[in-house]
């Protein structure tokens, strides 16, 4: 077990429950799994819109699959690196990170994220991973003021981008649009980091680090002209979670697209098979030469076998890499794919992006969600003490009276909505068909 500070919680707990012998991370996993924020993932878009088909993944089923892959990666690393067993704490830790990793993503996927980022452009921005950190540490009502009150190591593990918005944001942003219908996502990419509103909590998470480790951990890549800066480092646990997420995205979202007929065997062979036939790795060359036949087979068991083969291939190609510049073991070691498998995974991710995410039908759904979120924000911002639900009004007034960022309260409220709830609320506010008989929605 690593140093005890990583097991600490911001709020000291003295819960004496009968015969409760769970580890700190088993408790964290339970809190995430039983949270309202986690349950809402069942009705949030992964890639394909909720309701398009009964087969596809939602963010909840995606998170469950990421958790399974993450524990598989952990098991592989323990076998490959037995000398580093003390690094690998409870399996529940990795499960916790994987289950929680998407918990802050707003309705309508990337469209909702860009919409909230634009509406928050003068108020600290918005980004799904930053919102995840915010939900876990403050918004989810497991405690009064400390969110789920998770262990410090768990919070370190969800920090995919350990940096503050203000230190990463490129100041010379695009000109504001004259009409929100004209907003282009490419012009308003979210800053990937922690909101400045949550700086004190970030400081608490990093408190056990020595100064040199903290300074290095917060370093950024040099930004291209006109681009936001990107963070450089993440913890060991976070690196496992991120790899599991990437594998699930590339492989399972591919499966959804195949089943729904969005991609074709011809596209696969021309874009993937032709690219990977020159791989330096023999397993990649041999498997990808024929695996497309199974993926696009009319026999479902063959497709499932191919999906399992791909996941296994990537999981077993992961090892530990060491950065000697760090003293803290949780930062010194990261999980990483072999270079050839990393390239192969990138080919799959780009295939999904090119033929699925960029497909006009998918982009139309994303655009529709983008407009829904921006119009909801405009409405609530125009008269928050009239339109926000009672409890959210109280939070808004409290922030306003304390001179805090009250716009963040509106972003918190909208980002917590499911796709269906946001669409229904939008209808209640803007659809003339509903007249004056508006069904009062239960607050999230």
Swiss-Prot record:
Short name of one Pfam family for this protein?
A: HD_assoc
Q: Which residue windows are transmembrane per the record?
A: none
Tell me which UniProt keywords the record has, alphabetically.
Hydrolase
One MF term from GO for this chain? dGTPase activity
What is any one GO biological process for this UniProt entry?
dGTP catabolic process
Question: Is Hydrolase found in the keyword set?
Answer: yes
Where do the HD domain residues begin and end? Answer: 59-250
Q: Which InterPro entries is this protein grouped with?
A: dGTPase, dGTPase-like, dNTPase_2, HD/PDEase_dom, HD_domain, PHydrolase_assoc_dom
Annotated CDD domains: HDc (cd00077)
Give the family per the record: Belongs to the dGTPase family. Type 2 subfamily.
HAMAP family given in the database record: dGTPase_type2
User: In its UniProt entry, what is this protein called?
Assistant: Deoxyguanosinetriphosphate triphosphohydrolase-like protein
Output the lineage of the source organism: Bacteria, Pseudomonadati, Pseudomonadota, Gammaproteobacteria, Alteromonadales
């Amino acid at each position: 077990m690593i140093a005890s500070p990583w097991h600490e919680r911001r709020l000291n707990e003295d819960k004496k429950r009968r015969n409760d012998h769970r580890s700190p991370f088993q408790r964290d996993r339970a809190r995430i799994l039983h949270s309202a924020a986690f349950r809402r993932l069942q009705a949030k878009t992964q890639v394909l819109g909720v309701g398009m088909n009964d087969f596809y993944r939602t963010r909840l089923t995606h998170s469950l699959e990421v958790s399974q892959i993450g524990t598989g990666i952990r098991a592989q690393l323990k076998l490959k690196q037995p000398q580093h067993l003390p690094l690998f704490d409870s399996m529940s830790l990795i499960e916790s990170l994987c289950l929680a990793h998407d918990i802050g993503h707003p309705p309508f996927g990337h469209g909702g994220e860009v919409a909230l980022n634009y509406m928050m452009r003068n108020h600290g921005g918005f980004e799904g991973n930053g919102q995840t950190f915010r939900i876990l540490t403050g918004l989810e009502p497991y405690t009064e003021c400390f969110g789920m009150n998770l262990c410090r190591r768990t919070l370190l593990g969800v920090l995919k981008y350990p940096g503050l918005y203000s230190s990463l944001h490129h100041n010379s942003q695009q000109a504001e649009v004259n009409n929100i219908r004209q907003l282009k996502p490419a012009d308003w990419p979210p800053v990937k980091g922690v909101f400045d509103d949550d700086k004190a909590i970030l400081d608490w998470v990093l408190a056990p680090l020595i100064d040199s480790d903290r300074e290095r951990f917060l370093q950024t890549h040099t930004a291209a002209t006109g681009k936001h800066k990107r963070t450089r480092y993440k913890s060991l646990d976070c690196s496992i979670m991120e790899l599991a997420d990437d594998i699930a995205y590339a492989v399972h979202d591919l499966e959804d697209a195949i089943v729904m007929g969005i991609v074709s065997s011809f596209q696969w062979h021309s874009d993937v098979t032709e690219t990977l036939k020159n791989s330096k790795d023999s397993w990649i060359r041999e498997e990808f030469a024929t695996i497309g036949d199974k993926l696009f087979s009319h026999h479902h068991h063959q497709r499932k076998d191919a999906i399992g083969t791909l996941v296994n291939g990537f999981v077993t190609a992961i090892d530990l890499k060491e950065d000697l510049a760090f003293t803290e073991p949780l930062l010194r070691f990261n999980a990483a794919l072999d270079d050839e498998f990393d390239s192969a995974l990138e080919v799959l991710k780009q295939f999904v992006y090119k033929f699925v995410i960029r497909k006009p039908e998918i982009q139309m759904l994303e655009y529709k969600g983008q407009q829904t979120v921006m119009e909801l924000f405009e409405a609530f911002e125009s008269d928050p003490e009239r339109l926000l639900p009672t409890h959210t009004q109280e939070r808004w007034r409290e922030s306003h009276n304390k001179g805090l960022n009250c716009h963040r309260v509106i972003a918190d409220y909208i980002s917590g909505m499911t796709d269906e709830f946001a669409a229904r609320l939008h209808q209640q506010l803007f659809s003339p068909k509903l007249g004056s008989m508006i069904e009062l929605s239960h607050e999230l």
